[in-house]
Amino acid sequence: MAKDYSRTQRIGDQMQRELAQLIQREIKDPRLGLVTITGVEVSRDVAHAKVFITVMGQDDAGKIALNMEILNDAAGYLRMLLGKSMKLRSVPQLHFHYDESIRRGAELSALIERAVAEDGRRHGDETED
Protein backbone atom coordinates (compact mmCIF):
# COMPACT_ATOMS: atom_id res chain seq x y z
CA MET A 1 0.00 0.00 0.00
CA ALA A 2 1.38 3.42 -0.95
CA LYS A 3 2.24 5.72 1.91
CA ASP A 4 0.48 9.08 1.99
CA TYR A 5 2.99 11.70 0.91
CA SER A 6 1.32 15.06 1.38
CA ARG A 7 1.96 18.27 -0.49
CA THR A 8 3.54 19.88 2.57
CA GLN A 9 5.99 16.98 2.86
CA ARG A 10 6.96 17.33 -0.80
CA ILE A 11 7.43 21.08 -0.37
CA GLY A 12 9.50 20.49 2.78
CA ASP A 13 11.74 17.98 1.01
CA GLN A 14 12.30 20.31 -1.93
CA MET A 15 12.96 23.25 0.42
CA GLN A 16 15.51 21.14 2.31
CA ARG A 17 17.45 20.43 -0.89
CA GLU A 18 17.23 24.02 -2.15
CA LEU A 19 18.16 25.61 1.19
CA ALA A 20 21.20 23.36 1.58
CA GLN A 21 22.54 24.64 -1.73
CA LEU A 22 21.55 28.27 -1.10
CA ILE A 23 23.17 28.41 2.33
CA GLN A 24 26.36 26.91 0.95
CA ARG A 25 26.53 29.18 -2.12
CA GLU A 26 24.82 32.43 -1.18
CA ILE A 27 25.50 33.11 2.51
CA LYS A 28 28.96 34.67 2.57
CA ASP A 29 29.29 35.23 6.33
CA PRO A 30 32.67 33.77 7.39
CA ARG A 31 31.35 33.14 10.92
CA LEU A 32 28.84 30.60 9.59
CA GLY A 33 29.94 27.02 10.24
CA LEU A 34 29.24 23.90 8.22
CA VAL A 35 25.46 23.88 8.42
CA THR A 36 23.48 20.73 7.67
CA ILE A 37 19.73 20.90 7.20
CA THR A 38 18.25 17.84 8.88
CA GLY A 39 14.62 18.53 8.07
CA VAL A 40 11.94 21.03 7.11
CA GLU A 41 8.40 21.01 8.50
CA VAL A 42 5.93 23.08 6.49
CA SER A 43 2.64 24.21 8.04
CA ARG A 44 -0.60 23.06 6.41
CA ASP A 45 -1.31 26.54 5.04
CA VAL A 46 2.27 26.74 3.68
CA ALA A 47 2.77 30.05 5.51
CA HIS A 48 5.57 28.92 7.82
CA ALA A 49 8.42 26.43 7.66
CA LYS A 50 10.51 25.17 10.56
CA VAL A 51 14.01 24.48 9.27
CA PHE A 52 16.00 22.14 11.53
CA ILE A 53 19.77 22.42 11.33
CA THR A 54 22.94 21.10 12.90
CA VAL A 55 26.36 22.69 12.78
CA MET A 56 29.10 20.18 12.07
CA GLY A 57 31.73 19.97 14.76
CA GLN A 58 30.09 22.54 17.04
CA ASP A 59 29.08 21.65 20.58
CA ASP A 60 29.62 25.14 22.00
CA ALA A 61 26.25 26.75 22.75
CA GLY A 62 27.58 30.23 21.95
CA LYS A 63 28.79 29.25 18.48
CA ILE A 64 25.55 27.41 17.78
CA ALA A 65 23.57 30.49 18.85
CA LEU A 66 25.72 32.65 16.55
CA ASN A 67 25.01 30.34 13.60
CA MET A 68 21.30 30.42 14.41
CA GLU A 69 21.38 34.24 14.56
CA ILE A 70 23.14 34.44 11.19
CA LEU A 71 20.60 32.13 9.56
CA ASN A 72 17.60 33.86 11.11
CA ASP A 73 18.98 37.22 9.94
CA ALA A 74 19.34 35.80 6.42
CA ALA A 75 15.88 34.16 6.45
CA GLY A 76 14.27 36.90 4.34
CA TYR A 77 17.05 36.74 1.75
CA LEU A 78 16.87 32.94 1.64
CA ARG A 79 13.08 33.12 1.29
CA MET A 80 13.46 35.46 -1.69
CA LEU A 81 15.96 33.09 -3.32
CA LEU A 82 13.64 30.14 -2.64
CA GLY A 83 10.84 32.04 -4.36
CA LYS A 84 12.98 32.34 -7.47
CA SER A 85 14.04 28.69 -7.50
CA MET A 86 10.77 27.01 -6.47
CA LYS A 87 7.47 27.26 -8.28
CA LEU A 88 5.22 28.20 -5.36
CA ARG A 89 2.44 30.73 -5.16
CA SER A 90 3.70 31.86 -1.77
CA VAL A 91 6.98 30.91 -0.12
CA PRO A 92 6.76 30.07 3.60
CA GLN A 93 8.45 32.24 6.22
CA LEU A 94 11.57 30.47 7.43
CA HIS A 95 12.15 29.77 11.12
CA PHE A 96 15.49 28.11 11.91
CA HIS A 97 15.76 25.71 14.87
CA TYR A 98 18.76 23.78 16.15
CA ASP A 99 18.19 20.02 15.88
CA GLU A 100 19.17 18.38 19.16
CA SER A 101 18.32 14.84 18.00
CA ILE A 102 21.78 14.02 16.62
CA ARG A 103 23.53 15.12 19.81
CA ARG A 104 21.00 13.23 21.93
CA GLY A 105 21.43 10.15 19.75
CA ALA A 106 25.20 10.23 20.24
CA GLU A 107 24.75 10.58 24.01
CA LEU A 108 22.34 7.64 24.11
CA SER A 109 24.69 5.54 22.00
CA ALA A 110 27.56 6.29 24.39
CA LEU A 111 25.36 5.37 27.38
CA ILE A 112 24.38 2.08 25.76
CA GLU A 113 28.01 1.24 24.97
CA ARG A 114 29.00 2.02 28.57
CA ALA A 115 26.17 -0.15 29.92
CA VAL A 116 27.13 -3.05 27.63
CA ALA A 117 30.78 -2.77 28.67
CA GLU A 118 29.82 -2.67 32.36
CA ASP A 119 27.52 -5.66 31.90
CA GLY A 120 30.33 -7.53 30.13
CA ARG A 121 32.71 -6.83 33.01
CA ARG A 122 30.14 -7.96 35.59
CA HIS A 123 29.29 -11.05 33.59
CA GLY A 124 32.98 -11.82 33.16
CA ASP A 125 33.57 -11.46 36.92
CA GLU A 126 30.70 -13.83 37.75
CA THR A 127 31.95 -16.60 35.43
CA GLU A 128 35.47 -16.49 36.92
CA ASP A 129 34.22 -17.18 40.49
From Swiss-Prot:
This is Ribosome-binding factor A. GO terms for molecular function: ribosomal small subunit binding. GO terms for cellular component: cytosol. Keywords: Cytoplasm, Ribosome biogenesis. Belongs to the RbfA family. PANTHER family: RIBOSOME-BINDING FACTOR A, CHLOROPLASTIC-RELATED. SUPFAM superfamilies: Ribosome-binding factor A, RbfA. PROSITE patterns: RBFA. One of several proteins that assist in the late maturation steps of the functional core of the 30S ribosomal subunit. Associates with free 30S ribosomal subunits (but not with 30S subunits that are part of 70S ribosomes or polysomes). Required for efficient processing of 16S rRNA. May interact with the 5'-terminal helix region of 16S rRNA. It comes from the Bacteria. InterPro entries: KH_dom-like_a/b, RbfA, RbfA_dom_sf, Ribosome-bd_factorA_CS. NCBIfam families: rbfA. Transmembrane segments: none annotated. Monomer. Binds 30S ribosomal subunits, but not 50S ribosomal subunits or 70S ribosomes. Pfam families: RBFA. Gene3D superfamilies: 3.30.300.20. GO terms for biological process: maturation of SSU-rRNA; ribosome biogenesis. It is found in: Cytoplasm.
